[in-house]
Amino acid sequence: HLGVVGLGGLGHVAVXQEAIENLXADEFLI
């Protein structure tokens, strides 16, 4: 996990990546 605090943008990306791994949804790659 990336540090969400201080890295808001990258933190959001990390959450998106987890969503991709969990849901296997290519839609989140946007």
From Swiss-Prot:
On the 2D-gel the determined pI of this unknown protein is: 6.3, its MW is: 39.2 kDa. Belongs to the zinc-containing alcohol dehydrogenase family. This is Unknown protein from spot 365 of 2D-PAGE of etiolated coleoptile.
